[in-house]
Amino acid sequence: MNINLTMIGQAIAFFIFVVFCMKYVWPPVIQALREREKKIADGLQAAEHAQKDLELAQEKVAKQLREAKQQAAEIIEQANKRANQMLEEAKDQARTEGERLITAAKAEIDQEKNRAKESLRAEVAALALAGAEKILETSVDAGAHSNMLDKLAAEL
């Protein structure tokens, strides 16, 4: 009988132990497992969200980089156009200035040529007058013979 009574006592003790565990031990363990499961699920969800955010950020960075490269290319193109335009303007200004200088030089040359002609005419007239005086051995009055001198100057 002792064996049966011992077994019954052990069964009752085991039953009390199981009830105690189910009432006081098992709920905190289950709650801890559920909390851990929730933390893991939240962590996975946060990781997925972070991965999506990372992909969006990478796409945004790539887009901004493309836009920046495009803007840089446009700025370089505009700078090249402006440089070419400035070069053409400088060429035009140099050409205009050269033409102006050539025109001024030609005008100055013409003036010098006319002055030289006038000077030569005056010298030739004086020489002709001196030659005529020597030929006639008389003094030729410039006032009296101005028509003759004008004709002579015009012919020269």
Curated annotation (Swiss-Prot):
One annotated GO molecular function: proton-transporting ATPase activity, rotational mechanism
Keyword Transmembrane helix part of the UniProt annotation: yes
Transmembrane segments: 5-25
Role description: F(1)F(0) ATP synthase produces ATP from ADP in the presence of a proton or sodium gradient. F-type ATPases consist of two structural domains, F(1) containing the extramembraneous catalytic core and F(0) containing the membrane proton channel, linked together by a central stalk and a peripheral stalk. During catalysis, ATP synthesis in the catalytic domain of F(1) is coupled via a rotary mechanism of the central stalk subunits to proton translocation.
NCBIfam families from the UniProt entry: ATP_synt_b (TIGR01144), PRK05759.1-2 (NF004411), PRK05759.1-4 (NF004413)
Subunit architecture: F-type ATPases have 2 components, F(1) - the catalytic core - and F(0) - the membrane proton channel. F(1) has five subunits: alpha(3), beta(3), gamma(1), delta(1), epsilon(1). F(0) has three main subunits: a(1), b(2) and c(10-14). The alpha and beta chains form an alternating ring which encloses part of the gamma chain. F(1) is attached to F(0) by a central stalk formed by the gamma and epsilon chains, while a peripheral stalk is formed by the delta and b chains.
Family: Belongs to the ATPase B chain family.
Protein name according to UniProt: ATP synthase subunit b
Gene name as annotated: atpF
The UniProt record lists the keyword Membrane: yes
Highest taxon of source: Bacteria
InterPro entries referenced in this protein's UniProt entry, alphabetically: ATP_synth_B-like_membr_sf (IPR028987), ATP_synth_b/b'su_bac/chlpt (IPR002146), ATP_synth_F0_bsu_bac (IPR005864), ATP_synthase_B_chain (IPR050059)
Organism: Hahella chejuensis (strain KCTC 2396)
HAMAP family membership: ATP_synth_b_bprime (MF_01398)
This protein's GO CC annotations: plasma membrane; proton-transporting ATP synthase complex
Keywords: ATP synthesis, Cell inner membrane, Cell membrane, CF(0), Hydrogen ion transport, Ion transport, Membrane, Transmembrane, Transmembrane helix, Transport
Localization: Cell inner membrane
Its membrane topology: Single-pass membrane protein
